[in-house]
């Protein structure tokens, strides 16, 4: 094959492959910070805010690693993120922020602390265009420690994120 023809064939192949990669890009996700819904009656631990921030970072990294979502930067919207709280019971107050950030989905995580031993962790993935639940990852965690939170996040992403994106239990935080 003449080198000019080979160069054109390779150029077309590269363009087509690049288009396939672009077409399969992961949806942009507004990953909101973890919140605590504490019904334990216990005094909050001094490291709670750091633990919630760490859990949010672990969630962002774990979701990116799956290739299913690409996190958008919510930093420029920090005051709006703070005002849209508590997200686990505000209806869809977080959706305008997600849309402003250019996200296709909003990811809303919460830890419901029942006691220092028992908590539940929920992560809702919500379609930013219409507020419909895309998926719900939920489970129990044991312990009120950074290690328990990290393990809980990794477990939920690894074992509860459905392959087809259908709701695991259907419920959105409303």
Predicted regions, residues:
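N-terminal secretory signal peptides that target proteins for export/translocation
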Residues: 1-5
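Bacterial N-terminal signal peptides
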Residues: 8-20
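C-terminal/domain-edge helix-coil "capping" segments
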Residues: 25-39, 55-58, 62-67, 96-101, ...
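Short, well-ordered secondary-structure micro-motifs
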Residues: 41-42, 83-85, 119
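Glycine- and acidic-residue-enriched helix-capping/strand-helix junction motifs
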Residues: 42-54
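Generic, well-ordered alpha-helical segments
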Residues: 51, 55, 86-89
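Short, solvent-exposed, polar/charged sequence segments at loop or secondary-structure edges
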Residues: 65-108
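Hydrophobic residues positioned within well-ordered beta-strands of beta-sheet architectures
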Residues: 107, 121-122
